[in-house]
Regions:
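N-terminal organellar transit peptides
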Residues: 1-130, 137-226
Length: 226
């Protein structure tokens, strides 16, 4: 193929641009004005797409950064205020997380409970500890085949003077009880079994999670997600 037949290559020669460099960086048949545009950053491109589709990726340890999910839920409910609940576009939360900050977890769970816009939680790899509680809190709960769930009572570390440690322990014991009561109310888990099993790490595969009411469906076709 004679590359010099292409106008862009002739322009490149006139400007002293190496032809091979030109071919490494542009597509043939694309106008010069378009070719000179910088391609969008893949991360930002996907971020914009997810924002438009109301998709949130709960990846990695749960921390204050994930309060963005609470903000997203609030924003979507504001946008949907004049739309009937059944006509609202749902929010989809894809989960792969080892768990994390219990206070952030509780904020997310309560945002889900307050949301009139439907929130679908989807386990696509692991939902451990706090992430398992968030998974179970969705208005609709899904999981891909081969995924994993782990529940336990959580762990805390306290520091400071004895009075401060006692105050912290009392507060977080109360918070853990609230979370436990909530999880038992949205799943089929037996309270006695939960109390016994959750002392240590209690693991579920996708079928166990379905049977226990942690999820509503195991997804076998991606058409069910989109």
């Amino acid at each position: 193929m004679d590359k010099d037949k292409y106008p862009m290559i002739k322009i490149a020669k006139q400007k002293g641009i190496n032809k091979m460099d030109m071919f490494d960086n542009v597509l043939l048949g694309v106008s010069e004005s378009v070719a000179n545009l910088q391609l969008p950053d893949p991360y930002l491109r996907n971020l914009y797409r997810d924002e438009e589709d109301r998709v949130y990726w709960l990846d990695g340890p749960i921390s204050e950064e994930n309060l963005d999910l609470v903000k997203m839920i609030m924003r979507c409910n504001r946008e949907d205020k004049r739309i009937r609940e059944e006509d609202r576009k749902p929010i989809k939360v894809f989960i792969d997380s080892p768990g994390g900050d219990v206070t952030v977890e509780w904020s997310i769970i309560n945002a889900i409970k307050c949301s009139k816009t439907k929130i679908i939680t989807i386990n696509y790899c692991t939902a451990f500890s706090a992430a398992a509680d968030i998974l179970a809190s969705g208005h609709e709960r899904l999981a891909l085949p081969g995924t994993h769930v782990m529940m336990h009572n959580g762990s805390c570390s306290y520091g400071g003077q004895s009075d401060a440690v006692e105050s912290q322990k009392k507060y977080f014991d109360g918070l853990n009880k609230k979370i436990t009561d909530h999880i038992l109310s949205v799943t089929k888990l037996n309270p006695r079994v939960y109390k016994k099993k959750a002392i240590t790490d209690w693991f579920f595969d996708e079928n166990d999670a379905l049977e226990s009411g942690i999820i509503d469906q195991v997804v076998t076709d991606f058409d069910d997600l989109y």
